[in-house]
């Protein structure tokens, strides 16, 4: 897991094992931590007081998941030093690709754009889970799963022979969709919630299997990642913030639809801005992109 730690002279991203404990985190940052704050609503751990016995507790049991921002105070802090009264922060002006979470303005859900190169689904998932590009690894994961389960992923489901599909999805120009989302979600044990801009709804893959989830945004032909405060991408459906995050995601989708950010591939004609050909349906658009390498599309209105 990756955590952003600030305070006590520290401002860094920390990488730990998924089963890391509170002590593992403290040893990694090498600071005599007095207190730490995290989460939404904010939670506080007093390591030199009532919470001193929590050292061997796993971070996820404390509600600290990958992508969390943690603010620490060290024992070396001079508590007697008088700080000037805090000045009110100017109200942040949100961009069209941002939405306040819970209405407080403290947390913001925003679009993290990924490359528009026919691998956008894989880019979006890779950023949401790993914070880095793992497109080739994800494609290989899908290919192996398809080959290993020819009954589940039969020719009728795949719309082509099983072995052909397993080879086809390895090509960087091949578009991914629901099949790939489901396979990757199962393999990485994290639910994937797809925010559909045109339908203004969230399609949840494996929400009954996994508590942790990532959010990816779909405008009809392109996927992007969604992040909280430009860093957190993995959420937990049992955490208090989850409902507010999902509400903000739908509000953001509605706003983006009104600004023409989405494409209705079921009804509207989609135009290739490279060659000016027009298509109806995501499959037609995908086939054209895969055969030509064209990735710049617009909607005829």
From Swiss-Prot:
Keywords: Cytoplasm, Hydrolase, Isopeptide bond, Metal-binding, Nucleus, Protease, Thiol protease, Ubl conjugation, Ubl conjugation pathway, Zinc, Zinc-finger. The keyword DNA damage does not apply. Residues 243-248 are annotated as: S2 site. Its main location: cytoplasm. GO terms for biological process: endoplasmic reticulum unfolded protein response; ERAD pathway; protein deubiquitination; regulation of DNA-templated transcription. It catalyses: Thiol-dependent hydrolysis of ester, thioester, amide, peptide and isopeptide bonds formed by the C-terminal Gly of ubiquitin (a 76-residue protein attached to proteins as an intracellular targeting signal). Substrate binds at residue 221. Pfam families: OTU (PF02338), OTU1_UBXL (PF21403), zf-C2H2_OTU1_C (PF24560). Residues 218-222 are annotated as: His-loop. It is found in: Cytoplasm; Nucleus. Hydrolase that can remove conjugated ubiquitin from proteins and may therefore play an important regulatory role at the level of protein turnover by preventing degradation. Participates in the regulation of the ubiquitin conjugation pathway involving CDC48 by hindering multiubiquitination of substrates at the CDC48 chaperone. May be indirectly involved in PIS1 gene expression. This is Ubiquitin thioesterase OTU1.
